[in-house]
Design a protein with these regions (language model features):
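Conserved N-terminal/central alpha/beta ligand/cofactor-binding core
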Residues: 5-109
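N-terminal Rossmann-like FAD-binding beta1-loop-alpha1 element of flavoenzymes
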Residues: 1-3
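Flavin (FAD/FMN)-binding glycine-rich loop and adjacent Rossmann-like elements that form
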Residues: 13, 34, 38, 57-61, ...
Length: 405
């Protein structure tokens, strides 16, 4: 197995974009655990290193609480982690399972025989190389490989919200908070989250409107958001008690974008499926994050809908399978097939890992069984996922006094 990574660390935006926590309602909902598998293996390693706190343990320890609940979250079992602990844990997992990792490498060209993907061209400091592959999984976050392969994708070139996370230190006597309708800054809201070390926070308060497919937008957005970081810090110093002596530790290596293209799959995750809490028979994962819409024209979140703690829904296998006749390619992560209003529900950290794990498992089974990746037996896939610790039905979470404050 080969893994091609553009950055120098695995984890995508979770390490390179400073998305330093798993949101409440993604892996845990109320008294139920929803996502384990690879995600849980990573969290377990990070916890052992002192680099993460599970959501239910965070609440039971009363660390960083009470939260400001103006976002109306009804379940605050957030799992924060240290990006460095994540990087190290991911490296260890790859080494233990014999995965060949290519850091600082781009996948630049697809190789096909007819409609079958058979590998690709990669480029890095060693020049151009070819990797032949029996199966390919696109977890680029932008459906980049799927587009190269000729799979139909939606949202290509669409503009949307971009943000550059940054970390601040020396914050005193303050709790994580959210305040909407803040006109003094481009993001339009106060939004910051705890890091593992007391006094350190991750701030999500910069904003640029651009396209995932535009290098110019990424460049301009990075420059503008980096400038905004200083502006935001000054705003917090002047208006938020506890930030008087705060300073910027660093800014994330890359922007995060909500405007990336997505696969047009055999099935599509829809808002209706979430609102009805559907549990399809071909599900490959379960989760509970609600609907979180950001308008390019307005700051912060514009529409938030949370499920009741303990509720959840399933994600079908068809969202990782191209509708186009492209064989031996599956898609995982935040570019799986969704309608726009459902994107926020399946792009979060743990569920992105879950769909990626399912796509990879399906590819492995299809090779063993001698079938195309899209034609893998669903029962066989689900059995393999469960054997590897994936949850297709919830299991009880350790009890907490309450899920919110």
């Amino acid at each position: 197995v080969a893994l091609v990574e553009y950055f120098g660390a695995l984890g995508g935006l979770l390490t390179n974009g400073y998305v330093t926590n798993c949101e409440a309602g993604v892996a845990i909902s109320g008294d139920k655990i929803l996502i384990k598998g690879v995600f849980d293996k990573l969290v377990t390693r990070m916890v052992e290193k002192g680099g993460a706190i599970r959501g239910y343990d965070l609440i039971r320890s009363n660390k960083y609480y009470p939260f400001d609940t103006s976002r109306c979250e009804n379940d605050l079992q957030i799992t924060p982690w240290d990006p460095e602990a994540f990087k190290l844990s991911a490296d260890e997992l790859m080494a233990e399972h014999g995965v060949k990792v290519y850091f600082y490498t781009q996948f630049t060209e697809i190789l096909k025989e007819g409609n079958k993907v058979v590998g690709g061209v990669i480029e890095n400091r060693s020049g151009r190389q070819v990797i032949l592959a029996k199966r390919v999984v696109d977890c680029t976050g932008a459906a980049a490989v799927a587009q190269m392969a000729g799979a139909e994708c939606c949202g290509v070139g669409r503009k949307g919200s971009m943000t550059l996370m940054f970390r601040v230190g020396n914050v005193k006597n303050v709790v994580p908070s959210y305040k909407p309708n803040v006109k003094e800054i481009p993001y339009g809201a106060v939004n910051f989250f705890p890091l593992i070390r007391e006094g350190d926070f991750r701030v999500e308060m910069t904003r640029y409107i651009g396209s995932e497919n535009s290098a110019e937008d990424y460049t301009k957005g990075t420059i503008e958001c980096r400038r905004q970081c200083q502006e935001v810090l000054q705003y917090l110093k002047e208006h938020w008690i506890g930030f008087e002596d705060a300073y910027i530790i660093d800014t994330a290596p890359t922007l995060g974008s909500l405007a990336q293209p997505a696969l047009v799959g055999e099935k599509k995750m829809t808002q209706e499926m979430i609102l009805k809490r559907e549990m399809p028979d071909d599900r490959i994962a379960i989760t509970a994050y609600g609907i979180d819409l950001h308008s390019p024209e307005m700051g912060g979140q514009n529409f938030l809908y949370y499920l009741t703690p303990g509720e959840y829904y399933g994600v079908p296998f068809g969202v990782v399978v191209p509708k186009s006749p492209v064989e031996n390619l599956l898609v995982g992560g935040k570019c799986v097939s969704t309608e726009r209003d459902a994107f926020s529900s399946v792009c979060c950290s743990a569920i992105s890992m879950a769909t990626g794990e399912a796509a990879g498992t399906a590819c492995a089974i299809s090779i063993r069984e001698g079938v195309n990746a899209r034609d893998v037996d669903i029962g066989m896939l689900q059995q393999a996922l469960v054997k590897n610790g994936v949850l297709l039905d919830p299991e009880p979470a350790p009890s907490v006094e309450k899920y919110y404050v």
